[in-house]
Each structure stands twice: as structure tokens, then as C-alpha cells.
UniProtKB/Swiss-Prot annotation:
This protein's record includes keyword Cell inner membrane: no
Induction details: Significantly up-regulated expression with colloidal chitin and chito-oligomers, namely N-acetyl-D-glucosamine (GlcNAc), N,N'-diacetylchitobiose (GlcNAc)2 and N,N',N''-triacetylchitotriose (GlcNAc)3. Expression is unaffected by the oxidative-stress-generating agents tested including menadione, hydrogen peroxide and diamide.
Role description: Part of the binary chitinolytic system. Involved in hydrolysis of chitobiose and higher chito-oligomers (produced from cell wall chitin by endochitinases), thus contributing to the formation of germ tubes, fruit-bodies and septa during hyphenation. Hydrolyzes synthetic substrates p-nitrophenyl-beta-N-acetyl-glucosamine (pNP-beta-GlcNAc), p-nitrophenyl-beta-N-acetyl-galactosamine (pNP-beta-GalNAc) and 5-bromo-4-chloro-3-indoyl-beta-D-N-glucosaminide (X-GlcNAc).
Keywords: Carbohydrate metabolism, Disulfide bond, Glycoprotein, Glycosidase, Hydrolase, Polysaccharide degradation, Secreted, Signal
Name of the protein described by the UniProt record: Beta-hexosaminidase
Species of provenance: Emericella nidulans
Catalytic residue list: D225 (charge relay system), H278 (charge relay system), E349 (charge relay system)
Pfam name, any one: Glycohydro_20b2
pH effects: Optimum pH is 4-5.
Subcellular location per the Swiss-Prot or TrEMBL entry: Secreted
A GO molecular function held by the record: hexosaminidase activity
Length: 603
């Protein structure tokens, strides 16, 4: 009986995909294939009802078509049943059907006809990204309809994965196809950190290329941190004295370049200046008095005295009035460069001991002994948030959840500020949505892409352990996290299987606007950034675009396997240096590397 149930599941899968080799990622919300046979493509031209010369749409189509032609893509990972079963039924038609196919195949696709309803919709949060794509039997055109240009761009990236080589120097769509598609969540992002280590503009472009192909639409750019300040500020050019070198800086032109490159691919860039914690470099060059504890020992070895969770310490002085003058100047200058309505202003990991080094803060506490660190955080919110809102009526702020949920928190944080949740998984998502905050999910236990690679702090005596102290219990060097605070490593399966709205009410679930996978860069630079983002970020991309469940509500992780393995090869073909995730044997032998023989084990 178990054998029959498993075979039935696989047969259902086989019947849905047997006709085609392609397996686009993220999987469209709805896709249906015809049966009349391959549709050849000639030199396909873009047609619209509007003059689109030099527009985002025209340029996007030109890139897509150039990619299609130059790659002559052949899918590398094809879905098939677990090896013990017979091969999938072939899509070979009867003789009469073959004759019909041959006749229809004589009409090559020559055009992509795009109908956009709202050409002027800006690339901001909540913009409509839906599209339909139709390639009908006997038609010489692919029809794309979209509410906005941004939806049409997604149609192009889907089409790129559908058109493949015919093996004889030509290009084909394997069958007529109809797609109706739209994202589950409006916010689908990656976070890059250029404060711990510098990332070149070239490598930022590479990440944006991968994001566009997988329909991720937000680059959260954590610009700086205590370790370095790489961003040129006209108002305070001395801030880049705390860049790692003159070469490792971003000019205004560099910032605009990244914003423009992203926008051309339907991706928003949301900058983050992390404040008031994680703030030494740059700020201290303007005035050392606006930074507390910058010259203290971070004191992990004597934790009760610690001033930071990692080297080096430094937090903006919340009580010093000049702090807010400098913050306003820096914030307004960067707001003029980054065009998105949203801006991330940090708010995480305040360390109370740091303010023992501030005369301003210690005197403030002495003035009123009833004051607490919660009052200090509220002072920051009350003084800083009006500055952050002042640049635009459409400005919306994002903060890390600590400002609300940390031991040291502000008691009154406006609920129109978006909270990015990184700690305690479902528990914190529940707390935030219950209070009415919109939430970006970045749970470290599922989505932190830097985790599980050991520690980086040096002179660490914990590694000096020659024998296993307790073979029955995992420890630091024996089966434990080995210095990575958020270990283990987050595999694509860990990311894809995250049900981050689990147990939320419908009202709470509506407050979850999407997710971002952060890659903190303590151990990341140009050499390995793409390997650490990709292809794992593609698991997040499908999770927030079309979900991890099928129409019956069952987890579809086993069906996603070949899709992500194939997509890794597609990323490489497009110049995105994605990491190896399996022996190539697994790619070429679908499900032969599964842990569980039962393909329904995740349902």
C-alpha cells in the first residue's frame, strides 16, 4: 500500500512536468503547458503600444534576449521520479499529433507583445508586480500583460528560463504555455553588509543580477558599522578616514550607480545607517564626543563589563545634542541619493556598559535617579525619529526589532515603523505582529547566511582543546557550533522549509510583509560573497514569491530540489558565482541523494 501511495504521488508529479524539461525558479503561481509541440523562436522583437526607446522595459528586454541567444541554455537538472521507478512517461505524441505539431512548428515566434496598464508606476513598496505570459500554438508572438513595467520585467526573467536550445543551433519553447503569476509578498530581499568588509560595486552588481533572475526585489544595504565607514559624505569628508583604504570607499556616483543598476532590474535599494549602536567609525572623525566607548576594551573575556558584542565598540552618544546635528546632516545627504521611500535606521544591540564611558549619559542618569535604559532608548526615539521623518511625507522607517523587544528598549515606538525581526524566530514575529507592527522576517535560525562557519575573533583559548571532554554531549569543538554564535550553517532546505507565519492569526499574518536573508560580512568580501548568497538565496526567493507548498497545502521541498540545483547552473551561466551544494551526481540523478525514500515525508 505504501508503495502504491508513493508511486501515485510521483506519477502525478510526472504527468505535470513530463512534457517539458524547463523548471523555472521561482515556480510561477500558475503555469499550464500545451501539447502541440515545440515552438521555435527567430529574432524576437519587442512590441508595445507605447514608444519605449531607452526605457527600462526596452533595456530589460534587450538584456533578456541577449542572454537567451548567447546562453543557448540547456536545463542541467531535470525533474524525474526516484531512481527505482520507471522513467517518466515520455511526451512523444501519436503519428497524427506529430504531423499537427510539425505544421504548427513552422510558425516561429518573432515578437514579444507587451501590454502595460500603468507605465508610470514607481518602483516603491507595494507596486503591482503581477504578469501573465501566453505563448499560444500557431501564434508568432508571446503575449505579456502586466499592471506595471515591474511586472513585465519579471515576465522577461521567467521567459529567459523557458527558452532553451533545440540542440541544432536554434531556440525553442518546448510547448505552448500560459502563466499567471504574482508574488505572495511585496518585500523580498537580501542584506549586504559593507561595514565589516568592503564589497566592490562590481560584486554588488553580481548580487543584483542574481536577485533579478530569482525575482528578489529589495537590496537592504547595511552601509557601515563600527569597523569602518566607507561612504563619502560631502558634509563631513573626514568620515572616510575610517574606511579601510582610499580605494575601499563609495563615492556618490558609486551609490547612484548601484541604485540605477538595481532599478533597471526591478530592485529597490534600501540603505541602512545603523544607529545608535554599531557606530564608531566615521562618526568619531567628526567629533569624538558624539561617540561613547570607542576606545574601550570590548570585554568578551569579562562579560559583565562588555561594551560590545564584537570588536570594536562604539555607540552614538544619545544625550549629546551635537549627535543629532551630525546624524541629521549625514541622513539628509544620503536620503538625497537613495531614491526609495524607505530608509533603515538600525536600532539593534544597544550595550548599556558602553554609556558608562559617556559623561553626558552618566550625568543624565544622575539628574533623575528614576531614569532607566528604557528611558534612554525612548530619548533616542523621541529625538531621532522626527529627524528621520522630516525628509519626505512619504518616508517610511525600518528598524531592527531590538528597539521594541530588547531588554533595553523604548516603550513607545510608533507602529508605522517597520520592524525587522532577527531573533527568536516565530516567538518574536508573533510578539511584533500582535502589537500591530509590520514585520520583515530575517530570523537568524533560518535566514542568516553567514552562520555556521566558525568564529573569527582571535587569541581564542576555546579552540585549544585536544580531547573530547564529553563524547555524549556536543561541545564547542566536538559537534557544537565551533565559535559561530548562530550555527549551524543554514542550508537551502532550512530556508525553504521556514513557515514564518505559523500560528499567527489572519490579522497578524497580514502584518508580515516579506523576508530578507542577511549576510553579515565579518568573514565575507569580494572573494566569497556570491558563494555565500547563492544559490541559497534562491530558496528564499521562491519561499516569498510562490511559497513552499503546493495547491493541497503540502510542502513541495522535494520538487524544489531539482529546481534549485538547475538554477545554480543557470546562475553560473549568467556570471553569478553560486556555490556547489551537491555532488554533480545528485544533479544528474534526481532524488538519488534524498535522505528519505518516501517522497511525502515533508507533507
Amino acid at each position: 500500500m505504501a508503495y502504491f501511495r508513493l508511486y501515485a504521488v510521483l506519477l502525478a508529479v510526472a504527468s505535470s512536468v513530463a512534457a517539458v524539461k524547463v523548471n523555472p525558479l521561482p515556480a510561477p503561481r500558475h503555469i499550464s503547458w500545451g501539447h502541440s509541440g515545440p515552438k521555435p523562436l527567430s529574432d524576437v522583437s519587442l512590441r508595445t503600444e507605447r514608444d519605449t526607446d531607452d526605457s527600462i522595459l526596452t533595456n530589460a528586454w534587450n538584456r533578456a534576449w541577449e542572454t537567451i541567444v548567447s546562453l543557448e541554455w540547456v536545463p542541467a537538472g531535470i525533474e524525474a521520479p526516484i531512481p527505482e521507478f520507471d522513467e517518466f512517461p515520455t511526451s512523444t505524441p501519436s503519428a497524427s499529433a506529430a504531423a499537427t505539431r510539425s505544421k504548427r512548428a513552422n510558425v516561429p515566434i518573432q515578437f514579444v507583445d507587451v501590454d502595460v496598464e500603468d507605465w508610470d508606476a514607481d518602483l516603491q513598496h507595494g507596486v503591482d508586480e503581477s504578469y501573465t505570459l501566453d505563448a499560444k500554438a500557431g501564434s508568432d508572438a508571446i503575449d505579456i500583460t502586466a499592471k506595471t513595467v515591474w511586472g513585465a520585467l519579471h515576465a522577461f526573467t521567467t521567459l529567459q528560463q523557458l527558452v532553451i536550445s533545440d540542440g541544432n543551433g536554434g531556440l525553442i519553447l518546448e510547448q505552448p504555455v500560459h502563466i499567471k503569476d504574482a508574488p505572495l509578498y511585496p518585500y523580498r530581499g537580501l542584506m549586504v553588509d559593507t561595514g565589516r568588509n568592503f564589497i566592490s560595486v562590481r560584486k554588488l552588481h553580481e548580487q543584483l543580477d542574481g536577485m533579478a533572475l530569482s525575482k528578489l526585489n529589495v537590496l537592504h544595504w547595511h552601509l557601515d558599522d563600527t569597523q569602518s565607514w566607507p561612504v563619502h559624505i560631502d558634509a563631513y569628508p573626514e568620515m572616510t578616514k575610517d574606511a579601510y583604504s582610499a580605494r575601499e570607499t563609495y563615492s556618490h556616483d558609486d551609490l547612484r550607480n548601484v541604485v540605477a543598476y538595481a532599478r533597471a532590474r526591478g530592485i529597490r535599494v534600501i540603505p541602512e545607517i545603523d544607529m545608535p549602536a554599531h557606530s564608531a567609525s566615521g562618526w568619531q572623525q567628526v567629533d569624538p564626543d558624539i561617540v561613547a566607548c570607542a576606545n574601550s576594551w570590548w570585554s568578551n573575556d569579562n562579560w559583565p563589563l562588555h561594551t560590545a558584542v564584537q570588536p570594536n565598540p562604539g555607540q552614538l552618544d544619545i544625550i549629546n545634542p551635537k549627535t543629532y546635528e551630525v546624524v541629521q546632516d549625514v541622513y539628509e545627504e544620503l536620503s538625497s541619493i537613495f531614491t526609495d521611500d524607505w530608509f533603515h535606521v538600525g536600532g539593534d544591540e544597544i550595550q548599556p556598559n558602553c554609556y558608562n564611558f559617556s559623561t553626558y549619559v552618566t550625568e543624565w542618569f544622575q539628574e533623575d535617579p528614576s531614569r532607566t535604559y528604557n528611558d534612554l532608548m525612548q530619548h533616542w526615539v523621541d529625538k531621532a525619529v522626527p529627524i528621520f521623518r522630516s525628509v519626505s511625507d512619504s518616508r517610511r522607517l525600518v528598524m531592527w526589532e531590538d528597539v521594541v523587544l530588547n531588554t533595553e528598549h523604548a516603550d513607545d515606538v510608533p507602529t508605522d515603523i517597520v520592524m525587522q525581526s532577527w531573533n527568536n524566530g516565530l516567538e518574536n514575529i508573533n510578539k511584533l505582529t500582535e502589537r500591530g507592527y509590520d514585520v520583515i522576517v530575517s530570523s537568524a535560525d533560518f535566514m542568516y547566511l553567514d552562520c555556521g562557519r566558525g568564529g573569527y575573533v582571535t587569541n581564542d583559548d576555546r579552540y585549544n582543546e585536544q580531547t573530547n571532554p564529553d563524547p555524549d554531549t556536543p561541545s564547542f569543538n566536538y559537534g557544537g557550533i565551533g565559535g559561530s554564535w548562530c550555527g549551524p550553517y543554514k542550508t537551502w532546505q532550512r530556508i525553504y522549509n521556514y513557515d514564518f507565519t505559523l500560528n499567527l492569526t489572519n490579522a497578524q499574518a497580514k502584518h508580515v510583509i516579506g523576508a530578507t536573508a542577511p549576510l553579515w560580512s565579518e568573514q565575507v568580501d569580494d572573494v566569497n560573497i556570491s558563494n555565500l548568497f547563492w544559490p541559497r538565496a534562491a530558496a528564499l526567493a521562491e519561499l516569498v514569491w510562490s511559497g513552499n507548498r503546493d495547491a493541497k497545502g503540502n510542502k513541495r521541498t522535494t520538487l524544489f530540489t531539482q529546481r534549485i540545483l538547475n538554477f545554480r547552473e543557470y546562475l553560473l551561466a549568467n556570471g553569478v558565482m553560486a556555490a556547489t551544494v551537491v555532488p554533480k551526481y545528485c544533479l544528474q540523478h534526481p532524488h538519488a541523494c534524498d535522505l528519505n525514500y518516501d517522497q511525502t515525508v515533508l507533507h
